[in-house]
Amino acid sequence: MVSSFRVQQAAREIRAGAVIAYPTEAVWGLGCDPWNEDAVYRLLALKSRPVDKGLILIADNIRQFDFLFEDFPEDWIERMGSTWPGPNTWLVPHQDLLPEWVTGKHDTVALRVTDHPQVRELCALVGPLISTSCNPGGRPAAKTRLRVEQYFHGQLDLVLGGALGGRKNPSVIRNLATGEVVRPG
């Protein structure tokens, strides 16, 4: 486990506009502040990912997403809450409360409450984060720090060390309104 000092350092870097790599439940992730347009576009450029695809937001608890839930039916909130923290990502209506560089061309945004202790600590310090697999477009997601360095040598502001969470597959993605599984886990 990485020290709290390193997590606090990562939080400071993110607040200053950094793009970082960090271990998640199954693979290494790239992340940044979702409200920092320059950081998000830099992350997208590193991945060669089009902005219109949208990105996932992660948090350490469901309350960090409260600003999105004001008009949601209570059963939607209960449905999400019953699966978090954990490997469940929900597509929820964003109601134009998030910038287009996060949502892409979609009227929904992908949300997950992580169960990786280090990432939860980081989100507790900075709020929700962009989280996407650590890989250039078309390449497999990094499963080791060495692969992170090989993919993005010198291009990241910080690589937060630590262990993966032990999951073999990425999170399942479901549409909150319909229950449809968009991506199996």
Swiss-Prot record:
One of its GO terms (biological process) is tRNA threonylcarbamoyladenosine modification. Gene3D superfamilies: DHBP synthase. It catalyses: L-threonine + hydrogencarbonate + ATP = L-threonylcarbamoyladenylate + diphosphate + H2O. PROSITE patterns: YRDC (PS51163). GO terms for cellular component: cytoplasm. It is found in: Cytoplasm. GO terms for molecular function: ATP binding; double-stranded RNA binding; L-threonylcarbamoyladenylate synthase; tRNA binding. It holds the Pfam family Sua5_yciO_yrdC. It comes from the Bacteria. Keywords: ATP-binding, Cytoplasm, Nucleotide-binding, Nucleotidyltransferase, Transferase, tRNA processing. Residues 4-185 form the YrdC-like domain. Its EC number is 2.7.7.87. Its main location: cytoplasm. HAMAP family: TsaC. Belongs to the SUA5 family. TsaC subfamily. This is Threonylcarbamoyl-AMP synthase. It comes from Pseudomonas putida (strain GB-1). The gene is tsaC.
